[in-house]
Amino acid sequence: MRKVAIYGKGGIGKSTTTQNTVAALAEMGRKVLVVGCDPKADSTRLLLGGLAQKTVLDTLREEGEDVELDLVRKTGFGNTLCVESGGPEPGVGCAGRGIITAVNLMEQLGGYESDSPLDYVFYDVLGDVVCGGFAMPIREGKAEEVYIVCSGEMMAMYAANNICKGIRKFADAGSVKLGGLICNSRMVDNEKEMIAEFAKRLGTQMIHFVPRDNDVQRAEINKKTVIEWNPQAKQADEYRALAKAIDNNQMFVVPKPISVDELESLLVEFGVIS
């Protein structure tokens, strides 16, 4: 079973990218479990046809310790298994801690097992690696390969570089490696070439460039992934290509983060900042 974590700046499109990629993997016959590690609990919505799934933490609060697996693990598009860790009540407690609680409960309940063996578990993780709880999937060895969703915007690249620092920190202690950058296009000038160069400097690859397409939003309005909403769409093929690239990936590295000065000079070089 491959254990994958998807990281990236808040609002970059991690959850949308993850769900569309997972839908494409399911279409390829892969058995996938998605664990949403975000208090917003929107990591599985499109796979479940818009269903706002009950989170592990909400269920624990309501049911106490006596929780059945069926309450927190739902089946979505293409027989994907979907779990949302959820978060604490606003203003109380630590969301990172919630991820730890949710993953531990899933292990106790046998949530990582199914009728047919799992090929993948995907952790869709909130934002930047700013606190230990959100770093938990890579720190505790729950995830072994990381993909970072970024774009040609400065803050997205800055966040990606920071996440590489986190991976580097935990790579010594465990088996976590970076599998590549996924460029979720924001139509920035020279974006594709710049992210390919950025990946090279980090010692990794741009595993796929996902062009911007309004079909993604149209599918979301219909509470579906593009793969399910319009399998013939050009954008569906982009997600299939990304899924195949991940499925066939052999390049796993401990990244070499670059300095802020080097990052800024890269942005200047490609004309993003003057």
Curated annotation (Swiss-Prot):
Q: Which catalytic reaction applies to this protein? A: N2 + 8 reduced [2Fe-2S]-[ferredoxin] + 16 ATP + 16 H2O = H2 + 8 oxidized [2Fe-2S]-[ferredoxin] + 2 NH4(+) + 16 ADP + 16 phosphate + 6 H(+)
Q: Which parts pass through the membrane? A: none
**Sequence positions that bind ATP:** 8-15
On this chain, the residues bearing ADP-ribosylarginine are 97
What enzyme category does the UniProt record give?
oxidoreductase
Regarding how it is modified after translation, the entry says: The reversible ADP-ribosylation of Arg-97 inactivates the nitrogenase reductase and regulates nitrogenase activity.
Sorted keywords for this record are: 4Fe-4S, ADP-ribosylation, ATP-binding, Iron, Iron-sulfur, Metal-binding, Nitrogen fixation, Nucleotide-binding, Oxidoreductase
Supply the EC number(s).
1.18.6.1
Cofactor(s) needed by this chain: [4Fe-4S] cluster
Its GO biological process terms?
nitrogen fixation
Record's superkingdom?
A: Bacteria
Query: Any binding details for the cofactor?
Result: Binds 1 [4Fe-4S] cluster per dimer.
Keyword Cell cycle listed: no
Amino-acid positions noted as binding [4Fe-4S] cluster in the UniProt annotation, renumbered to this chain? 94, 131
Q: Name one GO molecular function term.
A: ATP binding
Please report which protein family the annotation says this sequence is part of. Belongs to the NifH/BchL/ChlL family.
| Subunit text | Homodimer.
The role this protein plays is: The key enzymatic reactions in nitrogen fixation are catalyzed by the nitrogenase complex, which has 2 components: the iron protein and the molybdenum-iron protein.
Q: Kindly give the PANTHER family that the UniProt entry links to this protein.
A: LIGHT-INDEPENDENT PROTOCHLOROPHYLLIDE REDUCTASE IRON-SULFUR ATP-BINDING PROTEIN (PTHR42864:SF2)
| Name the record gives this protein | Nitrogenase iron protein
Q: Which gene encodes it?
A: nifH
